[in-house]
C-alpha cells in the first residue's frame, strides 16, 4: 500500500474501459475515482470525444478538474482549454494527399464539434464501432457526404483528425 503514495496522477481512458456504457460509471468505479482524488492523486479523464461530449457522470466528480479530449489534442482544466494541438490547413491537405487512393473513413474535430463520413455515422458497426456507442456516434457527429472535400475546403485549423 505504500506504493500508492508514489502515484501522482491517474489518466483514465473512458470509452470501452472506464465507462459502464457510453455515458455512465459503475458505482464501484465512481467510488474508486473519488477515493483516489481524496488521497491527493490527480485524476484526469481522457477520451477521443470533444469536451462538449464528455459524460456528466465523469465531469461532475468533485476534484476531477482535468480532461484530455479530441483524441489527445485538447487539455482542459475546469472546463477551460489550457492547451490545444492543431493540425494546420496545409497539413490537412498533406494528410488527404497521403490517403487519396485509400478507402478510409475520415473524421475531423473543429472547435469542439465532430464531423465524420456519413458512411461511419449511418453504419458504425461496419467501421469498428461497438454497439453500445452507436447512439453516441449517431448523435454527436456532423454527417458529411464528402469528407475529403469538406476537410480540404475548411480554412481553419483542425483540433484533431482521425482516419
Give the positions of each predicted feature.
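Asp-based phosphoryl-transfer active-site loop
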Residues: 6-23, 95
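Active-site phosphate-binding/coordination module
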Residues: 27-131
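Acidic, His- and aromatic-enriched active-site or binding-groove loops in soluble protein domains
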Residues: 123-147
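C-terminal cap/substrate-recognition subdomain and adjoining C-terminal extension
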Residues: 139-163
Amino acid at each position: 500500500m505504500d506504493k500508492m503514495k508514489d502515484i501522482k496522477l491517474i489518466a483514465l481512458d473512458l470509452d470501452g474501459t472506464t465507462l459502464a456504457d457510453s455515458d455512465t460509471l459503475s458505482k464501484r468505479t465512481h467510488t474508486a475515482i473519488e477515493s483516489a482524488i481524496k488521497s491527493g492523486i490527480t485524476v484526469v479523464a481522457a477520451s477521443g470525444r470533444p469536451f462538449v461530449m464528455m459524460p456528466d457522470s465523469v465531469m461532475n466528480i468533485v476534484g476531477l478538474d482535468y480532461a484530455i479530449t479530441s483524441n489527445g489534442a485538447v487539455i482542459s482544466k475546469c472546463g477551460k482549454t489550457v492547451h490545444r494541438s492543431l493540425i494546420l490547413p496545409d497539413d490537412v491537405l498533406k494528410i488527404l494527399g497521403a490517403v487519396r487512393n485509400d478507402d478510409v473513413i475520415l473524421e475531423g474535430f473543429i472547435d469542439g464539434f465532430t464531423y465524420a463520413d456519413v458512411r461511419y455515422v449511418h453504419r458504425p458497426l461496419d467501421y469498428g464501432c461497438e454497439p453500445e456507442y452507436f447512439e453516441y456516434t449517431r448523435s454527436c457527429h456532423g454527417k458529411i457526404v464528402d469528407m475529403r472535400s469538406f476537410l480540404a475546403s475548411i480554412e481553419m485549423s483542425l483540433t484533431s483528425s482521425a482516419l
